[in-house]
Curated annotation (Swiss-Prot):
GO biological process: dTMP biosynthetic process; methylation; one-carbon metabolic process; tetrahydrofolate biosynthetic process
Pathway: Cofactor biosynthesis; tetrahydrofolate biosynthesis; 5,6,7,8-tetrahydrofolate from 7,8-dihydrofolate: step 1/1
Start and end residues of each DHFR domain: 10-228
NCBIfam families attached to this UniProt entry: PRK01827.1-3 (NF002497), thym_sym (TIGR03284)
Active site (UniProt): 490
Protein name: Bifunctional dihydrofolate reductase-thymidylate synthase
Family: In the N-terminal section; belongs to the dihydrofolate reductase family. In the C-terminal section; belongs to the thymidylate synthase family.
EC number: 1.5.1.3, 2.1.1.45
Protein task: Bifunctional enzyme. Involved in de novo dTMP biosynthesis. Key enzyme in folate metabolism. Catalyzes an essential reaction for de novo glycine and purine synthesis, DNA precursor synthesis, and for the conversion of dUMP to dTMP.
Pfam families: DHFR_1, Thymidylat_synt
Residues noted as binding substrate in the record, renumbered to the chain: 14-15, 31, 54, 108, 164, 170, 185
Length: 608
């Protein structure tokens, strides 16, 4: 299939349009569509006077060049024209610096304030049938008609060409099928307009990208990208060749460009001979569009937290980080480089950010972190302790599991105003809420059997008997009991989902200690999902971990630098004793971890 002229010469349109007044505006029966945004101008100026963010986007798009891609663009154009090099225009300004071309009509040119003429760092081209070069003091190109632009582009070294208005110019290029993409700003306010963007034929152009939504100059706005579809369009011979059936772009016969246009015509006659296959063009386009859509991102602050990227040489040397453990490591890196410095309850201080998500495929592996050795026995013993509904910290200490030790001391309990509480009586924490939600808590010795709501029993019953229920939730956040807990729950809510004989779990964690807590939480809820899946005769599917306040304690930073510079190993697998059918019957001996390859242990002090 023959390349289209706009594809070869990389011709785009860029514009901003507002909403225009409608008879039904504000009424219930008002109908909106893509043509709702079509207002271009009013009385020779922008209807909205000025929108600083849109101007920033316009400049970002029309000035961005990627010199590493230019050789391929140049080759494509030269091959298309069947010549070895681009002929530089000697009698016109031609910057040695690679730039984009911007093409505008006379009215648009006249609307630009004099101090901004010509548009800097761009090759300015004015399309006018009446103006001449001698009418301008500025370095600009003057063309009389659209086909002259194609001639000019064949002689220039440039990156991309952008049509920037006005309405008649847009219309002419669209009619001649000379627009590859339209970079379109939607100004979400209504203004009086007398000039409008031509209606876009949705059979010829489709929206391929939509940006974030912004506010600027008291209006919301966003940016969309239309791309020319692959539908068979009118052959560009009708645009340039000048056959009798379409004289929109006749050949010039009266100046030095005649030879150049004849070469274009000759190309069409021998199109099969000069076919070029550019399989990576779409990838290059997507890379540029990504840059455009990130125009408003603040440049990454160097050493925001006095941590230098050189501290992560191995981490940063990796081109692809697809191993699922990098979900966790990437969060740590982001927080250490860009996190907010905050004081905290413990007095240690943290770097923190808000809102992350990780997903682990339990059907493929058991996500036990490998960049440091984890205390797996402690993770399992704590989980079994939760499942039994226990609150006595001595039970774990007697098994040399010290996860809750610091939270059960006399000093810690007194700081929580739990003066009456015995040491290591942790109060109505996770296990109590899982098995006795709503029951009155007295102490760690009393028997709470058949008191409160047994949430764990209920969710297992729902999974077995009503697997499509959207109420399969387990909640540890009991507001009434928070002040009685040695430590309010960090991982507060999980929900289960059954499909196709598989069980998935999503867990929300309000407070996320990245150095110590989160690795345990990932493993614990993954094991929990395996256990519930087995007793419900299902297979484990996904564990999804949602993090709220994610933080790195200041006294963990040096240790985490070491961890981030370690390359993860393949995750291990988890095997449960298949004979266990009751969630309460599991013991530590029923869990087997196979092929746990890991780096050395990294010590970190707990901030309590």
């Amino acid at each position: 299939m023959m390349e289209q002229v706009c594809d070869v010469f990389d011709i785009y349109a860029i514009c901003a349009c507002c909403k225009v007044e409608s008879k039904n505006e504000g009424k219930k029966n008002e109908v909106f569509n893509n043509y709702t945004f079509r207002g271009l101008g009013n009385k020779g100026v922008l209807p909205w006077k000025c929108n600083s963010l849109d101007m920033k986007y316009f400049r970002a798009v029309t000035t961005y060049v990627n010199e590493s891609k230019y050789e391929k663009l140049k080759y494509k154009r030269c091959k298309y024209l069947n010549k070895e090099t681009v002929d530089n225009v000697n009698d016109m300004p031609n910057s040695k610096k690679l730039q984009n071309v911007v093409v505008m009509g006379r009215t648009n040119w006249e609307s630009i304030p004099k101090k901004f003429k010509p548009l800097s760092n761009r090759i300015n081209v004015i399309l006018s049938r009446t103006l001449k070069k001698e009418d301008f003091d500025e370095d600009v190109y003057i063309i009389n008609k659209v086909e002259d632009l194609i001639v000019l582009l064949g002689k220039l070294n440039y990156y991309k060409c952008f049509i920037i208005g006005g309405s008649v110019v847009y219309q002419e290029f669209l009619e001649k099928k000379l627009i590859k993409k339209i970079y379109f700003t939607r100004i979400n306010s209504t203004y009086e307009c007398d000039v409008f963007f031509p209606e876009i034929n949705e059979n010829e152009y489709q929206i391929i990208s939509v940006s974030d939504v912004y506010t600027s100059n008291n209006t919301t706005l966003d940016f969309i990208i239309y791309k020319k579809t692959n539908n068979k369009m009118l052959n560009e011979q009708n645009c340039i060749k000048g056959e009798e059936k379409n004289n929109d772009m006749p050949l010039k016969n009266d100046d030095k460009d005649t030879c150049h246009m004849k070469k274009l015509t000759e190309f069409y006659k021998n199109v099969d001979k000069y076919k070029i296959n550019y399989e990576n063009d779409d990838d290059d386009e997507e890379e540029d569009d990504f840059v455009y859509f990130n125009f408003n991102k603040e440049k990454e602050e160097k050493n925001k937290n006095s941590i230098h990227p050189n501290d992560f040489q191995i981490y940063n040397s990796l081109k692809y980080k697809y191993h699922p453990e990098y979900q966790y490591l990437n969060i740590i890196y982001d927080i250490m480089m860009n996190g907010n410095k905050q004081s905290d309850r413990t007095g240690v201080g943290v770097l923190s950010k808000f809102g992350y998500i990780m997903k682990f495929d339990l059907s493929q592996y058991f996500p036990l972190l490998t960049t440091k050795k984890l205390f797996l026995r402690g993770i399992i013993e704590e989980l079994l302790w939760f499942i039994r509904g226990e609150t006595n910290g001595n039970t774990l200490l007697n098994k040399n599991v010290r996860i809750w030790e610091a939270n059960g001391t006399r000093e810690f309990l007194d700081n929580r105003k739990l003066f009456h509480r015995e040491v290591n009586d942790l109060g109505p924490i996770y296990g109590f809420q899982w098995r006795h939600f709503g029951a009155e808590y007295t102490n760690m010795y009393d028997n709470y059997e058949n008191k409160g709501v047994d949430q764990l029993k209920n969710i297992i019953n729902l999974i077995k008997n009503d697997p499509t229920s959207r109420r399969i939730l387990l909640c540890a956040w009991n507001v009434k009991d928070l002040d009685q807990m040695a430590l309010p729950p960090c991982h507060i809510l999980c929900q289960f989902y059954v499909f196709d004989g598989k069980l998935s779990c999503i867990m929300y964690q309000r407070s996320c200690d990245l150095g110590l807590g989160v690795p345990f939480n990932i493993a614990s809820y993954s094991i929990f999902t395996h256990m519930i899946a087995q007793v419900c005769n299902l297979q484990p599917a996904q564990f999804i971990h949602v993090l709220g306040n994610a933080h790195v304690y200041n006294n963990h930073i040096d240790s985490l630098k070491i961890q981030l510079n370690r390359i993860p190993y393949p995750f291990p697998t988890l095997k449960l004793n298949p004979d266990i059918k009751n969630i309460e019957d599991f013991t530590i001996s029923d869990f087997t971890i196979q092929n746990y390859v890991h780096h050395e242990k990294i010590s970190m002090d707990m901030a309590a």
